[in-house]
Amino acid sequence: MYACSKTEIVKPQIEEIPFVVPSNFPDAVYKFDGNTLTNKGFYLGKKLFYDARLSADKSISCGSCHQQFAGFANLDHKVSHGVNNCLGKRNAPVLFNLAWQRE
């Protein structure tokens, strides 16, 4: 704690998550320089991904269309449903192996 010590500053420990590339995969396109994977960052991202308060009317989250059981795609509908149940023009793309996606 900073308030209890004037001589020693204790920095919080940040647990990094290793990014392991399978032996049969090419090098990842995305480089994690300056964006280290950490447990805190992972859990913050997960919380934001499933938080409906981030939508215009607080009714839908990213996870509403990018469904975990479906490889973070959407198997329930031909096209994604958005705010006010408006239909999109396409289905939610898969969120899987994004470190290898070029665009």
Q: Where are the model-predicted features located?
A:
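The canonical Cys-X-X-Cys-His
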Residues: G45, D57-F69, L95
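Gly/Gly-Pro-rich "capping" loops immediately C-terminal to redox-active cysteine motifs
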Residues: Q68-E103
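Short, flexible, mixed-charge glycine/proline-rich loop motifs
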Residues: A52-A56
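Post-cleavage N-terminal segment of exported redox proteins
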Residues: M1-L44, Q101
